[in-house]
Amino acid sequence: MSLFRWPAVACAVILVGVVTAAAWAREQANPYTVHALVSDASSVPAPATDANLINGWGLSAGPTTPWWAANNGTSTSTLYSGAGTKVALTVAVAGGPTGTVFNGSATDFVVSQNGKSGAARFLFANEAGMVLGWSPTVNGSTALVGADRSGVGAVYKGLATANDRLYASDFHNARVDVFDASFGLVTLPGGFQDPKIPKGFAPFGIQALGGNIFVTYAKQDAAAKDDVPAPGLGYVDEFTPDGKLVAQVVNSQKKNAPLNAAWGLALAPTGFGNFAGDLLVGNFGDGRVSAYAQSGAKWVYKGQLRVGDGTPIAIDGLWAIAFGNGAASGPVTTLYFLSGPGGEKNGLFGSITAG
């Protein structure tokens, strides 16, 4: 159970586990600070509140836009600046949105309604097995269905985009569904297969990073609809955009692989302390963020983000982690996050800074 402390900043910290001496030294010399920005209610202290922000899950932003938050608990998307200021737009996203991405193309991922058609600027996956798109020229207040895989029982927990494709992590069917620019289902030569992932684990989080697709795997519950959080459960893989396995980045069965229903993924930029350039992996299960550095064809555990007194950051119900765009969504060296604290009954939007 997390212990929350809310001084001028909001930080939940837990100290457990064993790390290597080298990792410990890096962590001690590299403190981070958590800042609460917006929550759904006063029970989760933050400078601002927004009742729609319940179980905030996915985060996306364009090159200059504010953050778009996928609020799984209210089936909405709300917008925030990097400073935590709410933008006066709330979009309805049916089915409990999870992952979200920005689309910069004026011709890809077209949605239609009442004789109008237009490219979706922001896209969402939901737990009902659909991909929806928001187009301001078609319907300014509601995201519209572009692809529907509910008929095969799909449960989409995440969404990524690369080139003119969408990648949705289908947790129920333990696969990655890929859609072309017209929302048509695509079969790729690689198929996003890793024979070393045991049965009972399924694609959970998914992000396009550094030209490749990174996928986290979590343990399925009996119905194969929700994750089973527990220390030491999970994997992270790297694939090409064609679904060919590049590397198994993290195997929780090995030493120094502290996964616990990991979902969030981000590449740290220059200026993010000693973990600059590393792959950051955020756990939903215990709220911790671990760093991995690429070393040739392998990835090496470097440690976890910690506050000044050495205890690891632990954000209750942690989902998305993503860096700002240098414009409306905040500095490129600031790591933003969404979470669903209190058993996903609340929501928090915040940031993490180095130093």
For each predicted feature, which ranges?
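Bacterial N-terminal signal peptides
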Residues: A10-V18
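Bacterial N-terminal signal peptides that target proteins for export
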Residues: M1-A10
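Sequence/structural signature of beta-propeller domains
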Residues: A21-G355
